[in-house]
Amino acid sequence: MITQIDRKAIRMKKHKRVRKSVFGTAERPRLAVFRSLNHIYAQVINDELGVTLATASSLDAEFKAAELAGGNVEGAKKVGELVAKRAQEKGVSKVVFDRGGNIYHGRIAAVAEAAREAGLEF
């Protein structure tokens, strides 16, 4: 009998493994990306204090004003730009990238590249 692969469980296992080494500090907070089927979310987190410094998602008003979809690469680029802009307003210029167990490809890579182009260093 063929068993179906539980992709979410595999992703969560990878995410736990990566989180052992990726930790956000006050100097370099963590840029965490979460991808769902229709939306994408990004947060800049200081893990020492347990505080979220900046957020952006495809559900934000600024994103919806641009009339983009969150489930594609163009939308992910816009989310990357938004989170970088909001992080810089809070005085954050360097971050550690947390891909959340996802493969660095497609929407995850688009968020990272757009954040780099907007001025975040990682």
UniProtKB/Swiss-Prot annotation:
Per the record, the gene is rplR
Please provide, alphabetically and separated by semicolons, the GO molecular function terms listed in this UniProt record: 5S rRNA binding; structural constituent of ribosome
Family affiliation: Belongs to the universal ribosomal protein uL18 family.
| InterPro entries tied to this protein | Ribosomal_uL18_bac-type (IPR004389), Ribosomal_uL18_bac/euk (IPR005484)
Q: Which domain of life is it from?
A: Bacteria
Protein name in the entry: Large ribosomal subunit protein uL18
What cystine linkages occur within this chain?
none
An individual GO BP term = translation
Q: What does this protein do?
A: This is one of the proteins that bind and probably mediate the attachment of the 5S RNA into the large ribosomal subunit, where it forms part of the central protuberance.
Summary of subunit composition and partner proteins: Part of the 50S ribosomal subunit; part of the 5S rRNA/L5/L18/L25 subcomplex. Contacts the 5S and 23S rRNAs.
Q: Which UniProt keywords apply?
A: Ribonucleoprotein, Ribosomal protein, RNA-binding, rRNA-binding
Family matches, as PANTHER family: 39S RIBOSOMAL PROTEIN L18, MITOCHONDRIAL (PTHR12899), LARGE RIBOSOMAL SUBUNIT PROTEIN UL18M (PTHR12899:SF3)
RNA-binding is among the record's keywords: yes
On whether Secreted is a keyword of this UniProt record, the answer is no
Output the Gene Ontology cellular-component terms.
cytosolic large ribosomal subunit
